[in-house]
Amino acid sequence: MFNLLKLVAKHRHLVKSRYESFLISNGHAILSNQSVIEIRDLHKAYGDLEVLKGVDITANRGDVVSLIGSSGSGKSTLLRCCNLLENSQRGEMRFKGEQISWIGKKHDRRPSDPKQVLRIRTNLSMVFQQFNLWAHMTILQNVMEAPVTVLKRDPSEVESAARAYLDKVDIGDKCDSYPAQLSGGQQQRAAIARALCMEPEALLFDEPTSALDPELEQEVVKVIKDLASEGRTMLIVTHDMQLAADVSDYVVFLHQGLIEEQGVPKTVFGSPTSERLRGFISAAHAIQ
């Protein structure tokens, strides 16, 4: 099925998974003192449309967790709730053991501490599908903007770091270019450098390759693989099953706002138990 079993067998996490500390009891994750992100019983609705119906997920330090599933399954909403770009209606959220505090009505809550929100957002850097670079700024200025403006860091120090991160993603020669002068793959790599320049605890990728053609997609995939090999904590929403198999310590399959199946890549892709997951993998294989 999908011939991913051979693929995942090559990778480090099947020899010794860094996700061994992710424990399951009665279908629920046990909290770990190594965790960066912990979510319990998360619910999110838009009016009468319930998008997340009670999701539990944990990402421990150094783990790469991929969220897969059909469009509309709740993957991107879950990621945006992690970063507090969306407010959930119910459930517990913790960042490095610190519980998010809420105010407001039960089904219309919001975080109560703006400083806590800023602290969490700056430590959970998002990489968006559509890059979201400022068109009027150079690539270097885009990467420097948040650390200087939001974190009030010294501009000269930030510039040195920004140039280093642009070199890291192989576009160090594009510092003075504007987004419109770059290919889609280069823009996404600039967005990754921007996220890294915040020095976050974790990176959150929302479909980082879906807006790219296959050739440009591989440029971004290489960067993500390199980051995974460094042991960075990452949550990745993706339709790219090969990417998920390559880099993940743990894969979560969502269906209609619930976790349908989860496990290490070898199990999820090689021995799926859910009929929905088997169908999803087969469909993804047919498309690719």
Please provide the spans of the model-predicted regions:
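Conserved signature/switch motifs of ABC ATPase nucleotide-binding domains
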Residues: S177-A180, M198, E230
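A short, surface-exposed alpha-helical micro-motif characterized by mixed small hydrophobic
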Residues: A244-D246
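Helix N-cap at the start of a conserved alpha-helix in ABC-type nucleotide-binding domains
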Residues: P214-L216
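Catalytic Walker B motif of ABC-type/P-loop ATPase nucleotide-binding domains
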Residues: L203-D206
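ABC ATPase "signature
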Residues: Q262-G263
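The feature captures the beta-strand-to-loop junction immediately N-terminal to the Walker
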Residues: I68-S70
